[in-house]
Amino acid sequence: VDHCWQSYNAWIAHFDLLGFKSKLETSPIHFLQSEVDGIVNDLQAEVKDFPSNVDYVLYADTFILYSKSSESKDYPALLHTATHFMEKCIYKGIALRGSISYGEIAVGNDKRTMIGRAFLDSYQYCEDQDWLGLILSPTASGQLAEMQIDPIRHGFIHEEIPWRKRSITNREVFAYSFCRGRSNFPCPLLQKLEEMEQLAPEGAKLKYERTIRFIEKHWQIV
């Protein structure tokens, strides 16, 4: 194993599958293997469009995309990869939440190991959401402000986020609206989310309801 480490400031998109622990207890391992294989295939399909900009690491129910450099050109690539990956998962009925952060990371051991403040930040903001959302953490929105990029132009909304533990909403957190512009039809994700809500355990249904209400509120119909 090559122990060489590379340290730099990076964009990180951290995704966590919802309900995976329950599936481990109730589903055959071959079923989970097939589901994870499908998710990995989708992740690889998105990353291969940006081979010089984005890479990934995965373990258990966690999937991480990260930029290969701190250059501003890597942000659009990571954003495209992250949003399309999340939408693909929901279309397949796979529940997940995600967050995008920015900061120092170190990648080593043949890219099998990742440490750094940005990794911790993305993990904390991802795990704390109480819906199926993709957010920009304050480290990400702060870096975008320095780059003079308005996240609202890329489908993000500044609105209160449903947290699991946090008692206040950080004004620098933005949520992805799943809307990239005006459309003449409702969001195609809504039907799948409603189906997923019907199948979800009673204690998890509110996560889907919050997501559906958020998308309906911000989807722009011509």
Regions found by a protein language model. Name each.
Residues 17, 102, 138:
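Residues immediately flanking
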Residues 91, 97, 119-140:
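Catalytic/regulatory signature loops of cyclic-dinucleotide turnover enzymes
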Residues 1-91:
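Catalytic NTP-binding/metal-coordinating core of nucleotidyl cyclase/transferase enzymes
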Residues 61-62, 66, 94-108:
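A short glycine-enriched loop-to-beta-strand structural element that forms part of the catalytic core
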Residues 2, 131-132, 136-222:
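Intrinsically disordered, glycine/charged-rich C-terminal tails and inter-domain linkers
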Residues 23, 108, 144:
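Residues that scaffold the ATP/ADP-binding catalytic core of kinase and kinase-like folds
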Residues 79, 107-126:
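Catalytic-core segments of nucleotide cyclases and related cyclic-nucleotide turnover enzymes
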Residues 81-85, 101, 121:
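Short, hydrophobic/aromatic alpha-helical segments in well-folded domains
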